[in-house]
Every structure is written in structure tokens, then in C-alpha cells.
Swiss-Prot record:
GO terms for molecular function: ATP binding; ATP hydrolysis activity; helicase activity; RNA binding. ATP binds at residues 269-276. One of its GO terms (cellular component) is host cell cytoplasm. This is Movement protein TGB1. The keyword Zinc does not apply. One of its GO terms (biological process) is transport of virus in host, cell to cell. It comes from Barley stripe mosaic virus.
Amino acid sequence: MDMTKTVEEKKTNGTDSVKGVFENSTIPKVPTGQEMGGDGSSTSKLKETLKVADQTPLSVDNGAKSKLDSSDRQVPGVADQTPLSVDNGAKSKLDSSDRQVPGPELKPNVKKSKKKRIQKPAQPSGPNDLKGGTKGSSQVGENVSENYTGISKEAAKQKQKTPKSVKMQSNLADKFKANDTRRSELINKFQQFVHETCLKSDFEYTGRQYFRARSNFFEMIKLASLYDKHLKECMARACTLERERLKRKLLLVRALKPAVDFLTGIISGVPGSGKSTIVRTLLKGEFPAVCALANPALMNDYSGIEGVYGLDDLLLSAVPITSDLLIIDEYTLAESAEILLLQRRLRASMVLLVGDVAQGKATTASSIEYLTLPVIYRSETTYRLGQETASLCSKQGNRMVSKGGRDTVIITDYDGETDETEKNIAFTVDTVRDVKDCGYDCALAIDVQGKEFDSVTLFLRNEDRKALADKHLRLVALSRHKSKLIIRADAEIRQAFLTGDIDLSSKASNSHRYSAKPDEDHSWFKAK
């Protein structure tokens, strides 16, 4: 049998493995049939030899390994029981429990583990499958990935994407916290500024602390329900224009919800002590404060200063205004519910009340004195009123010390003639009408609270005794002038007024009602 023919037959049958074997090896000389004894056994032995060579694993130079497709691939025939030969004498079969991947084969696996995602771990492949594809091998691959990244499976589960709603809540919480910090710093600085301003104006610090009110303070003291009921009762008997204004207030009471906690306190001073000067200084400072005037007639006194509004205009404004700092001038003219409602609408963190506690009247829940707020700074020294007026006011139960010059106080009969003054005032509507009938302009004392005039004439009649029982009104009427005060009074009431010996039998307190009955609510102020 010719060996060359046999090789050619193998080539034509496409057996590349035989080609690979004989290209780099020497073909041994096979004895002929005659040399082996003349029988045909040599041919059959040669075929068996070639068959075995065809199925024997191929050895490759330089220790290169052949690549197999998958872990399930097996070499048929003899190779099924023949161990794979690996360079450096490595074993081909390892136990699944303690099998280790050789150094040169671990590098590709580690590189691939860097690209793996914890959420979807990739199945081990490559060298792990080459060494049997056992379960132990896949576990080794997973452990390598976990140890390399330093993240356990439990930590990987917790490291999920945060929902948008949770992120939004977290962002809002951070904003609220930052806003609270900013607000606290602003209030502390403003308190220090108020303290310095009051001391420069010779106001005395009483040692009391600001009252800290909760955001729902309006509801806690039952004032919101009282005010709601009061507004509904007033709407039933009000005119069209007034009804619309009351309706808007009622809507605010029901719509505005608790916003922020706030601090509040009172700066109290006698007439002429410098309260208006303090308010102007605070408004001109570096702090963004808003001032609400309980008496809109004082608007001209604050001309050229930003942030000054009438209390009703600010409360019912169509344009929403917010401010951390709220100052209320002549607070005794404002209703307690209006102040708390204004604080809620402006979201103010501090409400500073400026006025004279002696000019207040705690008879019903509508009075701010009903809240019993602390007086933080006080002054009994007047720089505008002279000694004569200060002595007269002290007899009325309003103690004050004058550091001004001497002024003039003239007391005469109601009927007669006197020098004309800049302003004429009276306690009741009937007296105002009587003065106007004589050709003189006249105003109610309550309407000029907070205003100042160079000279004033005060008209008193016997019919005004009930109005004179109001200590608050007496102080207002006696302290509107700077240099001259003329008192024209009937003989029956003159002496009692000068000595303060007036029937002051006050009515019982009606703090359980927001508004008193008409006959208890100084109806003599208004025209009938």
C-alpha cells in the first residue's frame, strides 16, 4: 500500500486534523506487507493507527490551547476519557468544591467582572467553561465580581434608584430647613436692632421676653370662631359696600391656614415719647419690614418711606404681600383678630406692636389687650408735651414725666369766644355737629389718635359724660397738641374732668364675646 495515496485520500476528504499532524512531523516509514510477513494484517493495522491518530487530541506548539465552543462540547472517542493536557503541568480535572482557576486564566475573568452590573450579573464564560463549566466555577466567578467591587448582594438591592416623589420631598425638606435657618437669623438680628433703637430713644427694657405663638394660635384661643361669628352678624345689617368688605375678611378667616410660628411683643410709650421716631428708624434700616397703620390718617406722617400701608388695605389687598417682619403702629386701634389674620397672610415671623397700653381698652375679645401680650420696652417720658399737660394727664391716671418746655393749658366755658386753634376735637358725634353748626370744623377724638397739631381746642358737654368714662379717649384728647390746649367745657363736668373724678364704673368684661352690644361699644362715636 502506498502511503502517499493514503495521505491524498485524507486531504480530499477534508480531514484538517491529519494535515495539522503531518505538516510539522516526520512520516515514519511503514513496512510493506511483504516486509511484515506477506499477509494483509499490515494494511488493517495501518488503518487502525490512522483512525486512532485522527481521534487523538492534537498537541500545539508553545502551549497554545484549542478553543471549544461551549461547556457541553465533548471530544468523541478516546478523548472522552483522556485528560486535557495543559502547559506548566496544570491538572485538567478539579473538584467543584475546591477548584481554583490558574493565574493566566483568571485575568480575563477579572477584566470582565469590571464590566458586570450588580443588577444583572453575567453568566461566567470563557476559561471557566473550558475547565468543565461546573457549578463551582460559576460561583467562583460571582464571588470574584463581588469581592472586586466591594458590594454585597444586599447592598446592591438597596442601591436602587430613588423615586422622584421621595427626591422631591427630600428637596422640599431641605428648602424648608434652610428657610427656617434664614428666618431665625433674620429675627435674631432684627431683635438686636430693635433693642439698640429703643435704648437710644430712652425707652426702658422691662426684662420680659417676646411671646412665642404657635402657628395655630388664632384657633387655640378660640378667637377665629368668635371673629367668624362676629363677621356674619355684621354682614346681616351692613350696607352693600361694607358687606363686601366684611365678606372678604370672612373668606380670609376660612381660607388662610396656619403658616409659621411667630414672636410678638409691645413697645409702649406715652404721647410724645418718640414711638413714631422708632418706627421710622426700623423701617429705614436694612431689614425688610412692613408697617401697618391702624389709623390710616397717619399715612402722611410716613410719606417717602417704603413698606407703609393702612391695616385694612394690607389685609384686603388683591396683590399678595409677604414679609418676615411686621410692625403695627397705634395697635390699640386695631382689632385682635385683624392682627392675627394679617400675620397669617403675610407669613410674618415677628409682629412688633407699637403704641400706648394706656390707650387700650380690654373690654371684649376684639381688644388686643385680650391677648395679654408682654410689654418689652416702655417709656413714661414725653418730649412733646409740656409740664402743664403732663400734670393734667397724670391726674387722669396716665402717669408721665415731661422733658419738654412749658406749654399752655386754658380752661373756659363751653359757650363764648376763644382764640382759634389748628384743630377742634370732641368726644361725641352730637358735640361735633353742634360745633359745626357754629361754623367751625371739628373731628372726633378717636379719629386723630396718633396725629399731632400745634394747638388744639377740646369741646365738652354734660351729655358727653358717658364718653369721658373711657380713660383711653381722655388721654388721646389731652395729648394731641404741642404748645397750646384750650378746654371749653360745661360747668357741671368741668371740675370732674380736671380732677379725673368721673364715674368710671366700668362695665363687666365681655371677653367671651368678640364685639360688645351697641350700647356698650361707645355708640356715641357714630352718627345715628
